[in-house]
């Protein structure tokens, strides 16, 4: 991905303000300068990462302040759509130069052909080399986009951007919907970036390990951390440890100030009673006694006021310390009815072939609370297999039989009715469950109080996933087999952690189709199944090796 030195590469924002049409501010006075090299832009869903990239790319206009970009900029958005009838060379933006080269080679030396080519006489060789570096060496320039898989289409669009020799490259969730092979090719491209500025938004931890620094977008401001994802997490842990100490010290200070204030009140009251008693014994003149009482009252008020001020200051310091603590809520739910005895047969697949994908004859038996990762190239048929396991899709031959209640959570999250509230969506899947029981469980899925009444159609991406997960896991009868299709796609890392904590509470069998290896390893996978023309047992190490090698599966076969 390297290219000639780009001295003009620069990205900066000065006092940047951006507000949505409803008047909501996303950024208010944001200023930053992005250094050369690879920067990972991290932050929760809704923090504004994609919006910031679009502002850098000039696709959105600031409401105030300025964005300055120096050099040639290229932007890879999250959602890529290409005309399926488009030829690969046209998608790469080199079709006119190729045509001019062919014309000159055939003897047509009109000036217009030379003007089209300019100095780019090796454009075809560069295009093929770029495709090859991204694992698309088997893709011919005359093929159509419709012959490529979804992952290959993303890599093709990236190749087109690289051929522009950008000084600034913006990548927005580039590994979404990429299989492990395509991810590895993209990782290699990021590893090879040497000059200019690369900014990548991603929830892919393996990708974020490859950047030079992390820029965390949080509450409308940016904090910088040197190194990749692990270094960033270590820095956050150190910060949180220090913040925890500060909070404990602030709590202790508040308690001390409260104690001293109470002691002061007692002392002042005791002194006033004592002075009043003395005045009575001395039979002091009323005017003298009154003056002495007023003086004592003022002295006591000053002393109390001093300690009250100290207590207020201690409480303010406590609030500041508490704000520095990150509280990423976790899903902790009890699901005892999902438990499956260790020896019980949960799922049987015999000699299965599918109408779509690559599976020609696959067999599999799942017993007890096994946790199975289903891996394979894009187009291999993982989603098709999951649909066949649910009975939603009839296999071409063979059979799949579930011996326990099962639930399927698809990528599209279409288990939700957008017109219904979160609570009503769960009630649909859990007939016979009382409203109080539903709300009690939803609170554990972080939908507390009025949040459970929110219509599903108004939820953010992470909230929508939690609602769909709740409707799936809280279903009646309780699912003892759970099928998940690419569950971490489009989730921020906080939502991935919430999913992981929810699955820790699940006691049934799991089958998860995913390309997210760190996630799979975090949920305690016990078996790895590779889907190709058969269902084959494998392991995490082989999966990494297999999909890290371009020779493992030729481009264009997925």
Task: Please describe what each predicted stretch is.
Residues 2, 82-150, 412-481, 486, ...:
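ABC-family P-loop ATPase nucleotide-binding domains
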Residues 85-86, 90, 220-245, 531-558:
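Conserved beta-strand-loop-alpha-helix hinge in the C-terminal portion
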Residues 169-173, 178, 409, 481-486, ...:
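Catalytic Walker B motif of ABC-type/P-loop ATPase nucleotide-binding domains
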Residues 189-200, 502-512, 520:
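Conserved catalytic loops of ABC-family nucleotide-binding domains
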Residues 1-19, 97-154, 238-356, 553-558:
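Coupling and communication elements adjacent to P-loop NTPase active sites across diverse families
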Residues 13-16, 25-37, 65, 349-367, ...:
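Conserved beta-strand
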Residues 38-39, 51-112, 368-438, 515, ...:
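ABC ATPase nucleotide-binding domain signature region
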Residues 158, 186, 469-471, 488:
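Hydrophobic anchor residue at the start of the ABC signature
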């Amino acid at each position: 991905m390297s290219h000639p030195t780009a001295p003009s590469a620069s990205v900066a924002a000065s006092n940047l303000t951006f507000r949505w049409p409803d008047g909501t501010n996303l950024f208010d006075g944001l200023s930053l300068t992005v250094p050369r090299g690879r920067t990972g832009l991290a932050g929760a869903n809704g923090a504004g990462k994609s919006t910031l990239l679009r502002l850098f790319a000039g696709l959105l206009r600031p409401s105030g302040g300025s964005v300055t970009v120096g050099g040639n900029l290229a932007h890879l958005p999250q959602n890529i759509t290409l005309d399926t009838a488009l030829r690969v060379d046209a998608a790469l933006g080199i079709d006119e130069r190729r045509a001019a080269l062919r014309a000159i080679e055939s003897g047509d030396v009109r000036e217009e052909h030379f003007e089209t080519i300019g100095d780019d006489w090796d454009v075809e060789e560069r295009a093929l080399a770029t495709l090859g570096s991204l694992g698309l060496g088997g893709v011919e320039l005359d093929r159509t986009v419709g012959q490529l898989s979804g992952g290959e289409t993303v890599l093709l669009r990236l190749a087109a951007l690289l051929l522009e020799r950008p000084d600034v490259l913006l990548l927005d969730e580039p590994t979404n919907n990429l299989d492990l092979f395509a991810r590895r090719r993209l990782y290699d491209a990021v590893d090879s970036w040497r000059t200019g500025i690369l900014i990548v938004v991603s929830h892919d931890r393996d990708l974020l390990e490859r950047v030079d620094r992390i820029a965390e977008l949080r509450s409308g401001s940016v904090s910088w951390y040197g190194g990749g994802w692990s270094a960033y997490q270590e820095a956050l842990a150190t910060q949180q440890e220090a913040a925890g100490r500060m909070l404990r010290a602030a709590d202790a200070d508040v308690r001390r100030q409260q104690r001293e204030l109470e002691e002061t009140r007692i002392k002042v009251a005791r002194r006033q009673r004592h002075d009043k008693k003395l005045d009575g014994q001395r039979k002091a003149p009323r005017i003298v006694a009154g003056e002495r009482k007023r003086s004592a009252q003022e002295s006591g008020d000053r002393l109390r006021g001093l300690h009250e001020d100290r207590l207020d200051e201690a409480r303010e310091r406590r609030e500041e310390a508490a704000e520095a603590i990150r509280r990423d809520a976790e899903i902790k739910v009890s699901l005892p009815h999902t438990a499956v005895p260790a020896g019980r047969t949960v799922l049987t697949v015999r000699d299965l072939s599918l109408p779509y994908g690559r599976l020609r004859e696959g067999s599999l038996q799942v017993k007890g609370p096994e946790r199975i990762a289903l891996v394979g190239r894009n187009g291999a048929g993982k989603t098709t297999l999951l649909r066949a396991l649910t009975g939603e899709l009839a296999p071409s031959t063979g059979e799949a039989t579930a011996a326990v209640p099962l639930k399927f959570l698809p990528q599209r999250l279409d288990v939700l009715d957008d017109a219904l509230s979160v609570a009503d969506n769960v009630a649909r899947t859990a007939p016979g469950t009382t409203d109080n029981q539903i709300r009690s469980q939803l609170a554990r899925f972080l939908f507390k109080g009025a949040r459970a009444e929110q219509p599903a159609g108004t939820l953010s991406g992470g909230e929508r996933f939690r609602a769909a997960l709740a409707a799936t896991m809280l279903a009646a009868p309780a699912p003892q087999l759970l099928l998940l299709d690419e569950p971490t796609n489009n989730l921020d890392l906080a939502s991935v952690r919430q999913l992981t904590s929810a699955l820790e509470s699940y006691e049934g069998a799991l089958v998860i189709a995913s390309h997210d290896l760190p996630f799979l390893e975090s949920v305690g996978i016990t078996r790895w199944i590779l889907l190709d023309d058969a269902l084959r047992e494998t392991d995490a190490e082989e999966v990494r090796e297999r999909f890290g090698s371009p020779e493992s599966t030729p481009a264009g076969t997925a």
